[in-house]
């Protein structure tokens, strides 16, 4: 089931969006990736919630539980992959920034399909603070 983590008190610059901490949904079937992504978001002062697959992400939004500034979306997942999840969320009028996180970001056809589904940006694994911090700062003009 989905889990929630709040930002810590690390002495790093926090990313704020409109005077509030950035709220991130991490969608990934790999528990190690989810934990790594949670730790990265925490180190930049954000808060996060996780979903282990795309279906959980859709249910969170359908049930009205969701209000995220950013969704980090894995591409390859069981039950509902990142491309179909992104399409479904956009059909549901979800306006959150969606960033694809994939090991195949360098393959043009894979990246194109993911972007056409409604992504705002795509990052290649492994996700690091050095990759995500500048992107979030740029996307949200933080």
Swiss-Prot record:
One record GO biological process: phosphorelay signal transduction system
The keyword Transcription is annotated on this UniProt entry: yes
Keyword Transcription: yes
SMART domains per UniProt: REC (SM00448)
One example GO MF annotation: protein histidine phosphatase activity
Post-translational modification (record): Two-component system major event consists of a His-to-Asp phosphorelay between a sensor histidine kinase (HK) and a response regulator (RR). In plants, the His-to-Asp phosphorelay involves an additional intermediate named Histidine-containing phosphotransfer protein (HPt). This multistep phosphorelay consists of a His-Asp-His-Asp sequential transfer of a phosphate group between first a His and an Asp of the HK protein, followed by the transfer to a conserved His of the HPt protein and finally the transfer to an Asp in the receiver domain of the RR protein.
Pfam family of the protein (one): Response_reg
Gene3D superfamilies in the cross-refs: 3.40.50.2300
PROSITE patterns linked: RESPONSE_REGULATORY
Entry keywords, A to Z: Cytokinin signaling pathway, Nucleus, Phosphoprotein, Transcription, Transcription regulation, Two-component regulatory system
Ranges for domain Response regulatory: 23-140
PTM annotation (4-aspartylphosphate): residues: 74
Cellular component GO terms held in the UniProt record: cytoplasm; nucleus
Subcellular location: Nucleus
PANTHER family registered for this protein in UniProt: TWO-COMPONENT RESPONSE REGULATOR (PTHR43228), TWO-COMPONENT RESPONSE REGULATOR ARR22 (PTHR43228:SF1)
Functional description taken from the UniProt entry: Functions as a response regulator involved in His-to-Asp phosphorelay signal transduction system. Phosphorylation of the Asp residue in the receiver domain activates the ability of the protein to promote the transcription of target genes. Type-A response regulators seem to act as negative regulators of the cytokinin signaling.
Family in the record: Belongs to the ARR family. Type-A subfamily.
Protein name: Two-component response regulator ARR22
Organism from which the protein derives: Arabidopsis thaliana
């Amino acid at each position: 089931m989905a889990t929630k983590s709040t930002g810590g008190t690390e002495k790093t610059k926090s990313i704020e969006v409109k005077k509030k901490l950035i709220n991130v949904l991490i969608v990934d079937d790999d528990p190690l990736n989810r934990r790594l992504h949670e730790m990265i978001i925490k180190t930049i002062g954000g808060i996060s919630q996780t979903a282990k697959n795309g279906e959980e992400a859709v249910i969170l939004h359908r049930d009205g539980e969701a209000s995220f500034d950013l969704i980090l979306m894995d591409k390859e997942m069981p039950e509902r992959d990142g491309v179909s999840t992104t399409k479904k969320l956009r059909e549901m009028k979800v306006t959150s920034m969606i960033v694809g996180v994939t090991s195949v970001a360098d393959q043009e056809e894979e990246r194109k399909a993911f972007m056409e589904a409604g992504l705002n940006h795509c990052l290649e694994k492994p996700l690091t603070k050095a990759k995500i911090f500048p992107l979030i700062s740029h996307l949200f003009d933080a």
